[in-house]
């Protein structure tokens, strides 16, 4: 049953890529309730307001951005409408946090990744299912799906009750180098967006997935301010570049090292 559910979710994602996102993530539409069983929401014990998103890899592990780390993190699974609890909705706390560098330092172009082991595994449900790591590297020109509870307006922060989804395109990294001063010649990040502007990830979407051609290829890292401006794509941590590190940590391999 779990395999059937995962395959059905992947089929739904593929169908989503065939649709054009044309409305208000920014510039998107409300996600279908069955489209994002792997999407998780992060908040702290003191605040119920979501500050980041993440992706469920299996019953015990979540992948998100290093910039999403906080004290007393709470992770919610199976959430759609923040004000309406799903019957299979669950909450967990971290047991372990793994960063690509021991100091937890990261930059806007490198090592913005955090792997969380849950204190207690989550249960499979209608609205809870994992998303696999990518089996192939991403291809420039791919249509990618973004999603999250981030702001849906640029000039004034407006957080929706339900996650928004949108389609964007994957560009060569040089496009982001042209858009933002100070980016190094090479980076383990992906550049994605809409050059005309109007569609983009935004505040609180950090840590959420970038899904290209049905594969989990990126983690929301940072975007221009304000969001969704022309010629200002967002940057996403390249998940494929970190798969060996991720799989090693999950397998309890104490010798695994982060990519240089």
UniProtKB/Swiss-Prot annotation:
Cystines in this chain: 31-165, 52-68, 100-258, 144-212, 176-191, 202-227
Broad class of the protein's primary localization: secreted
Peptidase S1 domain boundaries: 25-251
Pfam hit, one: Trypsin
Molecular functions per Gene Ontology: toxin activity
Propeptide: 19-24
Entries under InterPro entries matching the protein: Peptidase_S1_PA, Peptidase_S1_PA_chymotrypsin, Peptidase_S1A, Trypsin_dom
Subcellular location per the Swiss-Prot or TrEMBL entry: Secreted
Tissue note: Expressed by the venom gland.
Keyword line: Disulfide bond, Glycoprotein, Hemostasis impairing toxin, Secreted, Serine protease homolog, Signal, Toxin
Any single GO CC term annotated in Swiss-Prot or TrEMBL for this entry: secretory granule
Superkingdom to which the source organism belongs: Eukaryota
Signal peptide span: 1-18
Role noted for this protein: Snake venom serine protease homolog that may act in the hemostasis system of the prey.
UniProt family annotation: Belongs to the peptidase S1 family. Snake venom subfamily.
UniProt name for this protein: Snake venom serine protease homolog 1
